[in-house]
């Protein structure tokens, strides 16, 4: 890849295949991104002109107060909502026209979990039914709303249930979403599909009593309210994109956070209102010509520099142009819209014909394909927790982790392991019975849930509810159907089995059994249980237990095969699944004795922490291995040999990292994978680290993870020695060194908590104990990989701040002195000056241990200031800093706020800046337009010689030319647009990303 950069003219076309190593990080489940708009700050609510018939026609409506809401300019003709509201003495009316290419697709049934009705085609309305209330409450700002005011808060969801074929109305009250109601008396609703199938008309009548209004609202009243409009996927199973509108443009809160973000519903005394013309304000055309020519259609980026070479105006970025001669007109203003003095200015121009994206693979995630697809068959299960449960019935295999954010909690596969659907139905304990699945959760609510195996959707018990309170408390690991009408549920801490009526879900008794865990029915009227360390048959009428195998090695859960044999998952030193016949004879042992190691090379022949198990119709044993690095579901042939293994999902937005000398070694968290970039394949190679504590020193960035999930790690080679650096969110980092297949700890920054007795009081007793926190630094001075107390010192002046830490190719550590970014909570500019400090690595001591300077020193000082989002460092010491200028209000130019991406030379001098930047979550931003670093979250890495990637929160990666600071391209898609769910879509809450130039092939 070569770039020619003449001033005032085109550069050579830049065309390349970019492979960002975010392959380990793709969420496998659509993850909602809602654009917070303020095209409308209020809606005018007019008197109903007469009797209103709820028939979906609106021909008896006065629509003069209606407003128009849409996703973005590219889709305003296909994704929009025109909404109107009316009132009379009895009710509030809500109606309008809803444009959607696949209208009225929402599979939430009235007998299902209607609290998820928002997760497809749905209209949400937040409405305070008391006009005397004006609240700025928000969980973002911490402002509170008194309970007496919250009584008037309505959180309403309107949808057409595809399953029921009717309009639904679900509401919860207060900001805590209490007292849920479904289709309460007096509410009427109707949706009518358009003749062309590209939209629908809807209308609702909602009595004032349902809205908790103290009186009918009328002309002269105004209330806080907001619309939130969701467009789901083609199947109606999950949210694709959405908007909020009727919004307070000065708020940076999201709608669900509280009324600080809401606009107004203004009740008019009369109808037939004159139309309000909304005039869009546009910038005046420029007058200073910048000319360029393209031999072929391409994309153009321009910035303006003054005589000293300083960037004064960020112009266009990757703007598409046809072949031929063109002129871009500059208006003579700087990035803050200030006139520039007369003088000599130079235009820097970059052109290219497009950057191609080549999909390689999704490391650590199974599925065909491993990324989410519109039909729900792509990707894998739960990104949180470890593999926990599996059950089979007929040709269905149901498995999952029980917790997730960006992947389905639970999935169904066929007997070959091909995913068929994903669902939010989940718990800790799973059983399947006659076409339905049943979960028991262990949390305080202890819910018993029922779902349909054909669709994954919640379905109702005989009493009409899909979710009930399960009997018992604490871990309830076993659930099995002992006959056609009864479940047995084990309660380990209570030493009993509960009996549950399958049809109603109601408890109908219990029997004693010591320390029960797994349960399994043999299909012939027999029930097996784990009791303590034994496996045996249990009489569900009396609790009488007859062991068939005693003193097993930490037995967990059970499964029976078609012949009535029973399998048990064993841990401890065994790490296998054993199959017994009814007499207790061992028929088969699945997996390598002792399992696979917790640290070191991955051995597929061994299990690790086997837990949930099931035997399918082909006699294959499915095993959930309850470990997270990696997450593996293994499937075994009846003869005990491994058949297949399935992996994932990784925690959402896991940041992958790589060995710069050998990029085929790719890492996600603490697992090393081997990637073949040409074949697009991967396999786990080793687990390199596990968390541990020595002498009070955590050898990792958190108690759960040695390597940061979202931050990943950086591998650095110095003097032939290979090190791994990973920084936590705050006040933590760890350095490890590779020694064969092991990585030994070499340094740790951490917060220590010491309990200090209070001063002795008059009674002669010490006062309350105080917890004192100090930041300590451990350095492995003798290079033995062990912690000695004498190696621990206070961090002192080595680290001014531990926010946005980074490391360079020489093991120098960079930290921020100044304000680290947090999402702005209010108006105002961020202008605090900042410095980037460097703690120099001084090489190695006599014993081979790392040595660092006693204090960090500033290498960049920026008096203009701002809050820092990210730092990246080149091998030559050049520093890149991503800076936020504070809150960008809806409709405000981010370019005018002081937000910027800046490159500083090794001496700390500004080299260039790029000002089309909206940092952080950018909740008030519009979807991506060419050249905009929208929701810029971090400098992804600095491992490429020519390109600096910046991670976008909504699923994009922005490439900036390192030499001149020109925008090159945006990869991926903004999820707040009408995106395509395919291999280029990373989805929202994207924190990861990395880039490298392959040392052997030269490919980026």
Regions found by a protein language model. Give the residues of each.
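Structural preference for beta-rich elements and adjacent junctions enriched in aromatics
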Residues: 26-275, 805
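Glycine-centered coil/turn sites that cap beta-strands in beta-rich domains
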Residues: 280-303
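Glycine-centered tight-turn motifs at strand-turn-strand junctions
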Residues: 311-340
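Surface-exposed loop and turn segments in beta-propeller and other repeat-based domains
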Residues: 367-380, 459-472, 587-605, 647-650, ...
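Signature of short aromatic-glycine-proline-rich micro-motifs recurring in repeat-based ectodomains
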Residues: 378-390, 426-428, 471-479, 516, ...
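Residue-level detector of Asp-centered blade-edge/turn motifs that repeat once per structural unit
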Residues: 392-394, 432-434, 481-484, 521-524, ...
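Conserved beta-propeller blade signature
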Residues: 397-400, 437-440, 486-489, 526-529, ...
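Short loop/turn segments immediately following the C-termini of beta-strands
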Residues: 402-403, 442-444, 492, 532, ...
């Amino acid at each position: 890849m070569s770039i020619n950069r003449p001033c005032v003219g085109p550069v050579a076309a830049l065309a390349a295949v970019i492979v960002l190593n975010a392959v380990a990080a793709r969420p496998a489940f659509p993850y909602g991104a809602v654009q917070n708009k303020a095209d409308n700050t209020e809606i005018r609510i007019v008197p109903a002109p007469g009797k209103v018939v709820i028939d979906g026609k609106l021909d008896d409506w006065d629509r003069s107060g209606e407003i128009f809401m849409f996703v973005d300019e590219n889709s305003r003709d296909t994704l929009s909502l025109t909404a109107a509201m009316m009132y009379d003495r009895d009710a509030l009316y809500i109606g309008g026209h809803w444009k959607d290419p696949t209208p009225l697709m929402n599979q939430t049934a009235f007998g299902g979990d209607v609290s998820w009705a928002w997760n497809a085609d749905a209209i949400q309305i937040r409405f305070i039914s008391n006009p005397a209330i004006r609240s700025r409450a928000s969980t973002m700002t911490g402002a509170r709303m008194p309970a007496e005011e919250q009584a008037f808060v309505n959180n309403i969801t309107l949808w057409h249930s595809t399953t029921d074929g009717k309009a639904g109305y679900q509401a919860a009250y207060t900001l805590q979403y209490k007292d849920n109601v479904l289709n309460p008396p007096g509410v009427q609703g109707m949706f009518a599909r358009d003749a062309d199938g590209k939209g629908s008309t809807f209308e609702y009548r909602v009595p004032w009593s349902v809205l908790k209004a103290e009186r009918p609202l009328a002309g002269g009243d105004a209330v806080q309210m907001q619309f939130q409009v969701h467009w789901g996927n083609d199947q109606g199973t999950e949210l694709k994109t959405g908007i909020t509108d009727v919004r307070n443009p000065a708020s940076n809160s999201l709608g669900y956070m509280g009324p600080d973000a809401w606009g107004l519903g203004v009740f008019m005394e009369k109808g037939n209102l004159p139309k309000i013309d909304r005039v869009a304000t546009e910038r005046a055309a420029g007058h200073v010509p910048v000319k360029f020519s393209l031999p072929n259609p391409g994309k153009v980026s321009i910035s303006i520099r003054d005589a000293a070479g300083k960037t004064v105006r960020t112009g266009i970025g990757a703007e598409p142009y046809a072949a031929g001669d063109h002129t871009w007109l500059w208006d003579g203003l700087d990035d803050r819209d200030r006139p520039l003095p007369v003088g000599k200015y130079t235009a820097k121009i970059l052109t290219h014909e497009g950057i191609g994206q080549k999909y390689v693979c999704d490391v650590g995630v199974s599925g065909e394909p491993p990324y989410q697809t519109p039909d729900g068959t792509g990707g894998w299960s739960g990104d949180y927790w470890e593999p926990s449960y599996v059950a089979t019935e007929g040709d269905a295999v149901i498995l999952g982790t029980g917790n997730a954010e960006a992947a389905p909690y639970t999935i169904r596969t066929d007997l070959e392991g091909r995913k068929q659907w994903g669902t939010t139905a989940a718990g800790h304990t799973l059983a399947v019975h006659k076409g339905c699945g049943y979960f028991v959760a262990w949390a305080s609510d202890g819910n018993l849930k029922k779902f349909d195996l054909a669709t994954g959707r919640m379905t109702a018990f005989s009493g009409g509810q899909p979710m009930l309170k399960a009997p018992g408390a604490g871990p309830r690991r076993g659930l099995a159907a002992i006959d056609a009408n009864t479940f047995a549920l084990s309660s380990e801490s209570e030493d009993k089995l509960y009996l549950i009526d399958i049809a109603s879900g109601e408890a109908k008794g219990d029997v004693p059994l010591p320390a029960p865990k797994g349960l399994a029915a043999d299909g012939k009227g027999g029930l097996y249980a784990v009791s303590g360390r034994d496996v045996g048959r249990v009489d569900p009428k009396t609790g009488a237990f007859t062991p068939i195998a005693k003193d097993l090695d930490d037995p967990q859960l059970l499964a029976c095969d078609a012949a009535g044999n029973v399998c048990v998952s064993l841990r401890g030193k065994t790490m296998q699944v054993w199959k017994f016949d009814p007499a207790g004879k061992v028929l088969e042992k699945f997996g390598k004795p002792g399992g696979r190691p917790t640290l070191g090379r991955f051995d597929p022949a061994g299990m690790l922490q086997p837990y949930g198990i099931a035997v399918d119709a082909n006699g294959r044993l499915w095993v959930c291995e309850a470990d997270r690095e990696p997450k593996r579901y293994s499937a075994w042939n009846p003869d005990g040999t491994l058949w297949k293994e399935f992996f994932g999902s990784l925690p959402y937005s896991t940041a992958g990292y790589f060995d710069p000398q050998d990029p085929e070694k790719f890492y996600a968290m603490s697992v090393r994978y081997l990637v073949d970039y040409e074949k697009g394949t991967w396999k786990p190679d080793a687990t390199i680290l596990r968390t541990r504590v020595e002498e009070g020193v955590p050898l990792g960035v958190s108690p759960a993870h040695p390597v940061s999930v979202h931050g990943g790690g950086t591998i650095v080679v110095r003097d032939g020695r290979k090190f791994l650096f990973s920084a936590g969110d705050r006040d933590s980092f760890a350095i490890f060194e590779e020694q064969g297949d092991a990585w030994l700890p070499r340094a740790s920054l951490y917060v220590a908590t010491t309990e200090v007795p209070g001063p002795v009081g008059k009674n002669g007793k010490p006062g309350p104990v105080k917890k004192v926190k100090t930041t300590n630094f451990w350095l492995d001075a003798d290079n033995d990989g062990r912690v000695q107390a004498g190696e621990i010192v206070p961090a002192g002046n080595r680290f001014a701040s531990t926010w946005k830490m980074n490391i360079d190719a020489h093991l120098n550590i960079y930290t921020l002195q100044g304000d680290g970014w947090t999402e702005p909570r209010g108006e105002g500019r961020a202008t605090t000056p900042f410095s980037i400090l460097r703690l120099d690595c001084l090489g190695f001591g006599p014993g081979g241990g790392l040595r660092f300077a006693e204090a960090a020193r500033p290498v960049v000082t920026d008096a203009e200031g701002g809050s820092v989002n990210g730092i990246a460092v080149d091998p030559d010491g050049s520093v890149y800093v991503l800076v936020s200028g504070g809150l960008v209000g809806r409709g405000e130019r981010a370019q005018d706020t002081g937000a910027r991406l800046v490159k500083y030379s090794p001496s700390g001098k500004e080299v260039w800046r790029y000002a089309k930047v909206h940092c952080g979550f950018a909740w008030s931003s519009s979807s991506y337009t060419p050249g905009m670093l929208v929701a810029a979250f971090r400098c992804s890495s600095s491992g490429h010689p020519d390109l600096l990637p910046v991670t976008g929160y909504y699923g994009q990666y922005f490439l900036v030319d390192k030499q001149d600071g020109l925008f090159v391209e945006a990869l991926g898609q903004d999820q707040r647009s009408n995106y395509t769910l395919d291999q280029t879509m990373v989805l929202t809450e994207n924190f990861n990303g990395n880039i490298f130039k392959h040392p052997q092939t030269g490919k980026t």
